A protein has these predicted regions:
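Short His-centered aromatic/hydrophobic patch
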Residues: 32-37, 54
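Membrane-proximal helix-turn-helix segments that form the acceptor-binding/catalytic region
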Residues: 16-20, 73-94
Length: 222
């Protein structure tokens, strides 16, 4: 409740600071990933072209993600969605990841599709025989590696000859390592640093796990 009461003040402060930075930088182009600034970025007078990038699907974000049969909530969802679309329509362009996703935005005429650009050559294709499971991503709450490690503690009891390798780096590394040790998984779950040949690591594994709490079309599955 306290966080909810403080939100209007924090949002006003965020908007003020955001606008100040743009006025000082005077960029030619401002690219937003369409979070809190979506409601006001098109109104800023810094002179830059405003472009939005939408990294998740429409129906898993914001008001569209609300699921309820309550008439009042349905009405609220419709109003929030109208405001959302109106804000998007005022941007110079809205960039999506796939043409399929573009089909969900029939109200907009300012869409562009730019797929994830990384194409990693596959020097080795998994034969499915290695008893290795791989996960890749930042060591951050979004990626859900804490949940994955908890789940792996159950898997390791039934399949002790399998090993989970999690490739990445981030501020949760020490916390995740402590979790691994606490669950007695030191030999069954390994935190590996980022590598340049991640495609080879996929080829050395039999199973890939995406444990994210929320995710767009991630580059780890591209």
């Amino acid at each position: 409740l306290i966080k909810l009461l403080k939100y209007p003040f924090r949002y006003h402060r965020f908007r003020k600071r955001f606008a100040k930075v743009l006025r000082e930088l005077r960029p030619d182009i401002t690219i937003s990933t369409l979070r809190r600034e979506l409601n006001f970025i098109n109104k800023l007078d810094d002179g830059s072209i405003k472009i939005g990038e939408f990294h998740v699907t429409r129906y898993a974000y914001g008001a569209e993600a609300l699921k309820s049969g309550n008439p009042l909530l349905k009405w609220l969802k419709a109003q929030l969605n109208k405001k959302f679309v109106r804000n998007l329509s005022q941007l110079k362009r809205v960039v999506l990841l796939t043409h399929e996703e573009a089909g969900f935005w029939s109200e907009l005429t300012n869409l562009s599709v730019i797929p994830n650009p990384i194409i990693t050559p596959l020097n080795k294709i998994s034969d499915g025989k290695a008893k290795r499971v791989i996960a890749v991503g930042r060591y951050a709450p979004q990626k859900g590696f804490d949940m994955l490690i908890d789940s792996w503690a159950l898997v390791a009891q039934k399949y002790p000859d399998w090993t989970l390798y999690i490739y990445g780096d981030g501020f949760l590394r020490a916390e995740l390592q402590e979790q691994i040790e606490r669950l007695g998984l030191t030999e069954k779950c390994r935190l590996e640093h980022t590598v340049n040949n991640i495609a080879d690591k996929y080829g050395e594994s039999s199973i890939f796990v995406l444990s994210s709490r929320y995710e767009g079309f991630g580059m780890v599955i591209t």
